[in-house]
Design a protein with these regions (language model features):
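Paired small-residue
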Residues: 103, 114-122
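Juxtamembrane intracellular "pre-TM" segments in multi-pass secondary transporters
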Residues: 2-31
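Short amphipathic helix-loop junctions that connect adjacent transmembrane helices
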Residues: 46-65
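Structural signature of the two symmetry-related core transmembrane helices
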Residues: 91-106, 186
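Intracellular juxtamembrane helix-capping segments at the cytosolic ends
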Residues: 129-143
């Protein structure tokens, strides 16, 4: 079977310098939302099984919690696009961030299976809404001529943060504990929500 050769699409327009694009409020808002959504999800998902075992739960129970978490991460994708189309990118992204913060608050309520599993499920859905919404917001930051380099910068920021979060989660869990992690994440979410609220107000005015 022979596949047709890919056709090159003409890119019209002059691309702005990447530094100029990265300094725009639109890019800062979208990148911050994506970095915090994905970074906190990776951090907590990595730390949660260790915390569960440390609290006396079995490895099997920790694994089941991660399975529910992964299902919550990708299950909503069947309708996330429709929600974004109906309510808007910013609102769904903000909802995802609120759910991530709520997952941390639920984790602070106890060390039982219901708190761990419920927190992981909330975290998964929050990541879905937050990251997909932030990715959709990013598309408004660039022209076709700028798309490749802007997406590359955003991916570098997001997945660089994910790598650091994944490698550092165990050490931080050992240093401050499960409760300390879930308390410490809250200001990050608040900062991004404040950026988004400021940008939304600026657009309306």
């Amino acid at each position: 079977m022979r596949l047709p050769a890919p056709q090159k699409q003409a890119i019209v327009g002059t691309a702005r310098p990447l530094k100029a694009i990265a300094a725009t409020p639109q890019f800062i808002e979208a990148a911050a939302a994506g970095v915090v959504s994905y970074g906190l999800m990776a951090f907590l998902m990595t730390a949660a099984p260790m915390a569960m075992v440390g609290c006396g739960h079995s490895v099997g129970e920790a694994a089941l919690g991660i399975q529910w978490h992964v299902l919550a991460m990708f299950g909503p994708s069947f309708f996330t696009g429709r929600l974004i189309g109906r309510f808007g990118q910013r609102k769904i992204t903000a909802l995802g961030l609120v759910m991530i913060a709520a997952s941390g608050l639920l984790a602070l309520m106890g060390e039982g299976l219901s708190e761990f599993w419920g927190s992981l499920i909330l975290l998964g859905v929050g990541w879905n809404f937050g990251f997909i919404g932030a990715t959709a917001m990013l598309t408004a930051c660039y022209t076709p001529a700028e798309r490749t380099k802007v997406q590359a910068l955003n991916d570098f920021l997001v997945f660089g943060t994910v790598a650091i979060a994944s490698f550092g989660s165990g050490q931080l869990l050992h240093s401050v504990g499960w409760s300390g992690i879930n308390i410490g994440m809250q200001p990050l979410v608040v900062i991004v929500l404040a950026i988004m609220a400021w940008q939304a107000r600026k657009i309306k005015s």
